[in-house]
Amino acid sequence: WFNDLKQQCRAEMISIIDVTCQAIKHANTTRVGLLATTATVKARIYQDNLITDNIDCYTPDDADQHQVMESIYAYKSGDIAGAYSLLSPVKDRLLQAGVEKIILGCTELPLILEQEVRTSPQHYVDATEELIKKTVEWYFTHNTRNNIAA
């Protein structure tokens, strides 16, 4: 649906899915895990994009996906420690299964796993961060005024 919308829109649009998958591809990663909302996982928007580049995308089983959602809800309700205790084992199982990187495909997930992202950044791709980087790059590429400092 994104590409259809993009074709009908005059404004430049950047896809969070595309920029995240490009980051995975440029890292020469072939096995990734996906932590995201159930709707995102079931829609297969990351998986279908990655498969075109022969990148295997692993998702949590139903029980673990339920824990991901409970973790997100816990974080939103202010239970940071509870959110971490729910999400950390799911993340560990993906890494133990041999994924090279984990896509953090929901804005709360990098916050819940903040310590791990900071200490082991090689294991994570934060979709929101990838979108921000691409947006800033786009701005400076398309900015005609040379006097704006970053």
UniProtKB/Swiss-Prot annotation:
<dbReference type="GO" id="GO:0047661">
    <property type="term" value="F:amino-acid racemase activity"/>
</dbReference>
<protein>
    <recommendedName>
        <fullName>Uncharacterized protein in pnlA 3'region</fullName>
    </recommendedName>
</protein>
<comment type="similarity">
    <text>Belongs to the aspartate/glutamate racemases family.</text>
</comment>
<dbReference type="InterPro" id="IPR033134">
    <property type="entry name" value="Asp/Glu_racemase_AS_2"/>
</dbReference>
<dbReference type="InterPro" id="IPR001920">
    <property type="entry name" value="Asp/Glu_race"/>
</dbReference>
<dbReference type="InterPro" id="IPR015942">
    <property type="entry name" value="Asp/Glu/hydantoin_racemase"/>
</dbReference>
<dbReference type="Pfam" id="PF01177">
    <property type="entry name" value="Asp_Glu_race"/>
</dbReference>
<keyword id="KW-0413">Isomerase</keyword>
<dbReference type="InterPro" id="IPR004380">
    <property type="entry name" value="Asp_race"/>
</dbReference>
